[in-house]
């Protein structure tokens, strides 16, 4: 198995790359903390730079010491920002930051569970040939980034892709 980055970071890198429409990765820099006597990392800090000036930073840890567990995903741009857990969207309107978070009808099922239900429905639709199969080219890019992050951490330097 992998450490914290492979376990928790891979889905975050996948989400970030997907939201950005899988831009071509250019370079990766990573630092991973592997306590003595262990083969896997407890924490990782990874920076990924892609084409078009898009950059991502991932801070992943199994060893967070604090009062409560923290998880968030945030995207920033010159026109606004968005954050998950809970969803919050801020956009500049009339020169001021304005909360434009979508409100919706409350449901009995949370968004996390809804996402799994949607993923399963999509999978079944592909198996039944109701939806075209998508080639895994995005996942090949994702795994090249993950591999480059581990190589960067091992060698202590940036890895160009």
Where are these regions (language model features)?
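Beta-strand scaffold of nucleotide-dependent catalytic cores
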Residues: 57-60, 84-86
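C-terminal substrate-binding/catalytic lobe of Rossmann-fold NAD(P)-dependent oxidoreductases
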Residues: 49, 66-70, 76-86, 117-118
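A general structural signal for well-ordered alpha-helical segments in protein cores
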Residues: 12-13, 117-121, 146-147
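Rossmann-like dinucleotide-binding domain that binds NAD(P)(H)
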Residues: 1-55, 61-66, 70
């Amino acid at each position: 198995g992998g450490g914290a980055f492979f376990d928790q970071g891979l889905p975050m890198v996948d989400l970030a790359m997907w939201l950005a429409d899988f831009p071509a990765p250019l370079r990766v820099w990573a630092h991973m903390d592997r306590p003595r006597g262990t083969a896997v990392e407890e924490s990782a800090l990874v920076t990924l730079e892609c084409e078009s000036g898009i950059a991502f930073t991932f801070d992943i840890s199994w060893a967070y010491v604090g009062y409560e567990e923290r998880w968030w995903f945030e995207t920033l741009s010159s026109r606004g920002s968005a954050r998950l857990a809970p969803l919050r969207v801020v956009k500049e309107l009339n020169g001021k930051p304005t909360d434009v978070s979508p409100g919706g009808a409350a449901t009995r099922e949370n968004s996390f569970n809804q996402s799994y239900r949607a993923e399963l429905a999509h999978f079944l639709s592909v198996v039944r040939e109701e939806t075209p199969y998508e080639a895994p080219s995005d996942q090949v890019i994702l795994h090249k980034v993950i591999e480059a992050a581990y190589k960067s951490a091992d060698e202590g330097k940036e890895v160009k892709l």
